[in-house]
Amino acid sequence: SQTKMPFALDWKFEGPSAPYFYAIDNGYFKSEGLEVEISAGKGSLDAIPKVATGAFPVGFADINSLVKFLDKNPSAPVIAVMMVYDKPPFAIAGRKSLGITSPKDLEGKTLGAPPPDGAWAQFTPFAKANNLNVEKIKVEPVGFPTREPMLAEKKVDAITGFSFSMFLNLVRLGVP
């Protein structure tokens, strides 16, 4: 009999989750006695507690978010067992037409950032490494579903997110 194995993703079904679906479709998990069911998530800060509470035995999440979670919850029964990205896909996307061509250009502009976003969580060290005056950057808390549309509609000058997700969403919205 197959062992049920719920798997919590950090995000929607996008490119990075393809290997897991490939393994399901080609019977790799089944041949190991596993019945894997993949659930979409709402960010790493959604996936990690699902595993820590036992709601899911395994999940996919950003290592930086896990470190932050474990700092606040040192006795949580959750560990990292594998690295997927060789470097994080954190990015800030801005529009040339709005004057964003370098990190310093964020000063005097509005940055749209979802509060639970992994890229936003790394903004402070990014700003420090790039000598940014964060007091000159207006940060607009935005939702994940509205992030790219707000940039497309020029309601914000730049956004935080994962490079591959933002790129595809912005192309879909017709942003050059």
What are these regions (language model features)?
Residues S1-E153, D157-F164:
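Short, glycine-/small- and polar/acidic-enriched structural segments
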Residues V156, V171-L173:
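Extended amphipathic alpha-helical interaction segments
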Residues S165-M166, L173-P176:
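Short, intrinsically disordered, charge-balanced linker/junction segments flanking boundaries
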